[in-house]
Amino acid sequence: MPKTIVREEETIEETLRRFKREVSKSGNLAAARKKEYYIKPSVEKKNRRNKMSLR
């Protein structure tokens, strides 16, 4: 998890913006969203096949 230290004379908005940027770069949020629901391996394979056929 990214850590953000508040710098001197930095507003909360700037710190929050910096923190959001670090979180998006780390990919933690995307990984958490991906694992939000369990997808059966057979369904995952079916989705991959459909995705490849669309290309």
UniProtKB/Swiss-Prot annotation:
One BP term from GO: translation
Annotated family: Belongs to the bacterial ribosomal protein bS21 family.
Q: Does the keyword Ribonucleoprotein apply?
A: yes
Keyword Chaperone present in the record's keywords: the answer is: no
Q: Which InterPro entries match?
A: Ribosomal_bS21, Ribosomal_bS21_sf
Gene3D superfamilies xref list: Ribosomal protein S8
- Annotated GO CC locations: ribonucleoprotein complex; ribosome
Protein name as it appears in the record? Small ribosomal subunit protein bS21
Where does this protein come from, organism-wise? Phytoplasma mali (strain AT)
Q: Which UniProt keywords apply?
A: Ribonucleoprotein, Ribosomal protein
> What molecular functions are annotated in GO for this chain?
structural constituent of ribosome
